[in-house]
Amino acid sequence: MPGSALLCCLALLAGVKASQGTNTQSEDSCAHFPAGLPHMLRELRAAFGRVKTFFQTQDQLDNVLLNKSLLEDFKGYLGCQALSEMIQFYLVEVMPQAEKHGPEIKEHLNSLGEKLKTLRMRLRRCHRFLPCENKSKAVEQVKSDFNKLQDQGVYKAMNEFDIFINCIEAYMMIKMKS
């Protein structure tokens, strides 16, 4: 019996050590996240570059969807929520509609969406970058304006995706300094 108790203790210790190793790996990936961010943003910009011309030629509107108040929310105390809501907005509302307007660019849009999902996953894993609860009025305004534009909203939102990437970058620079 003492031998089996010792065996159980060793198994328990091995399990604890393995779970500690997992936490360390997660903590390590969060420690390295800021260094990898420029690469992730470059990948987002490159993926967007593959569809940008299509949406620029289709966007016939002079107004701006992603305006200065959105950037201010990204830089302010609502930055976390603005980022989270905008990622969700692009993934759930804009990109699925965009695929319908340009089947020839569907593969590139899927790639862009996957890169955005990867960024969201990494932000959520590293809680200090995305710990939020409040709603952003600027994001609500973007969504409202998008819906008012109907079919043209997709072209406008996708044409301004680079502005969204710049907002992500501004938010992350602020978070990395704090």
Curated annotation (Swiss-Prot):
Signal peptide: 1-18
Cysteine disulfide partners in this protein: 30-126, 80-132
Keyword NADP carried by entry: no
GO cellular component: extracellular space
Keywords: Cytokine, Disulfide bond, Glycoprotein, Secreted, Signal
List of glycosylated residues: 67, 134
PROSITE patterns: INTERLEUKIN_10
Pfam families the UniProt entry points to: IL10 (PF00726)
Keyword Disulfide bond: yes
Cellular compartment(s): Secreted
One term of GO molecular function: cytokine activity
InterPro entries linked: 4_helix_cytokine-like_core, IL-10, IL-10/19/20/24/26, IL-10_CS
Assembly and binders: Homodimer. Interacts with IL10RA and IL10RB.
Family stated for the protein in its record: Belongs to the IL-10 family.
Name listed for the protein in its UniProt record: Interleukin-10
Source organism of the structure: Cavia porcellus (Guinea pig)
Gene (name only): IL10
